[in-house]
């Protein structure tokens, strides 16, 4: 509960951007471009698809590497081979919910390649499966008014709490 959808983010080398866009436009049957939150050099991490598309269309084509928080989480997932959640963000498809969302990112590697070292994983990286999470939707069915129930969500960065949300 609370996932606004499930999608795939493709790692696109700068020199592969034109071919990727042509394929994306064929698949989506729409004139979709790569959008950035802030200009940056290097590979693009582009939201290629997400379901359900109806409530997430605004996210398709977004280069998540163009925002430091999203890029850092994606890079950590790629390096470690583990699922990583971003720090609090504002979803493109839910702009009125400022800093109330997260992306859960899990790296996807091309088959048949070694994944022993960080360098192996970086070379084999195809992209990430991901789920955008809006905290209000995640907690919608949780009754925080029960006296025996306490909930604390903390964002930890380098072992330090950066954001705390508590109830109970």
Segments the model singles out, each with a brief description of its role:
Residues 1-168:
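Intrinsically disordered, low-complexity polar/acidic regions
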């Amino acid at each position: 509960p609370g996932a606004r959808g499930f999608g795939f983010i493709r790692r696109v080398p700068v020199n592969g951007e034109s071919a990727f866009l042509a394929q994306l436009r064929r698949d989506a049957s729409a004139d979709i471009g790569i959008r950035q939150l802030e200009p940056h050099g290097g590979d693009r991490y582009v939201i290629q698809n997400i379901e359900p598309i109806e409530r997430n269309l605004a996210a398709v084509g977004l280069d998540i590497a163009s925002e430091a928080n999203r890029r850092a989480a994606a890079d950590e997932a790629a390096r470690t081979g583990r699922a990583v959640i971003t720090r609090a963000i504002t979803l493109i498809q839910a702009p009125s919910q400022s800093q109330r969302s997260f992306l859960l990112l899990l790296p996807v590697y091309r088959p048949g390649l070694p994944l022993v070292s960080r360098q192996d994983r970086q070379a084999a990286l195809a992209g990430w499966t991901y789920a955008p999470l809006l905290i209000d939707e995640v907690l919608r069915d949780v009754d925080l008014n029960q006296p025996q129930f306490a909930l604390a969500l903390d964002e930890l960065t380098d072992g330090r709490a950066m954001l705390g949300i508590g109830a109970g």
